[in-house]
Amino acid sequence: MMDINEIREYLPHRYPFLLVDRVTELDIENKNIRAYKNVSVNEPFFNGHFPQHPIMPGVLIIEAMAQAAGILAFKMLDSKPSDGTLYYFVGSDKLRFRQPVFPGDKLVLEATFLSSKRQIWKFECKATVDGKAVCSAEIICAERKL
């Protein structure tokens, strides 16, 4: 549905912080998105987290979910960062980690729009690997004009 070139139009992030590789489903009417991140052993964070037992840092799983939610928000508004709008990750509620993410995993990211009020957007998000829950949270983003 969206390859990395189109994703780069909707996210301001770049290597090594672009954490969405592909969008496989995007339903504006039902306000949800499904995307994924291929987790490679070559990710820079694996050098220190942890060298003998590499796992993806939880904060980066949360960030990946927030980036998927950001793409959904931009698509819902029919805008892009180049239009002068950004979404900042400002918080999370109901955050839970279920299992670690390892090199070689395909991290599937899902986000559903819940609400917005005064440029504060809330999304229900989850991340899975091989159909098993890895992380879930309500992600809160602030819409800001540059």
Swiss-Prot record:
GO BP terms: fatty acid biosynthetic process; lipid A biosynthetic process
Location in the cell: Cytoplasm
GO molecular function list: (3R)-hydroxyacyl-[acyl-carrier-protein] dehydratase activity
Keyword list, A-Z: Cytoplasm, Lipid A biosynthesis, Lipid biosynthesis, Lipid metabolism, Lyase
TM annotation in the entry: none
Enzyme Commission number(s): 4.2.1.59
Coiled coil: none
Catalytic residues in the record: H49
UniProt catalytic activity: a (3R)-hydroxyacyl-[ACP] = a (2E)-enoyl-[ACP] + H2O
Function: Involved in unsaturated fatty acids biosynthesis. Catalyzes the dehydration of short chain beta-hydroxyacyl-ACPs and long chain saturated and unsaturated beta-hydroxyacyl-ACPs.
Protein name: 3-hydroxyacyl-[acyl-carrier-protein] dehydratase FabZ
Species per Swiss-Prot/TrEMBL record: Pseudomonas syringae pv. tomato (strain ATCC BAA-871 / DC3000)
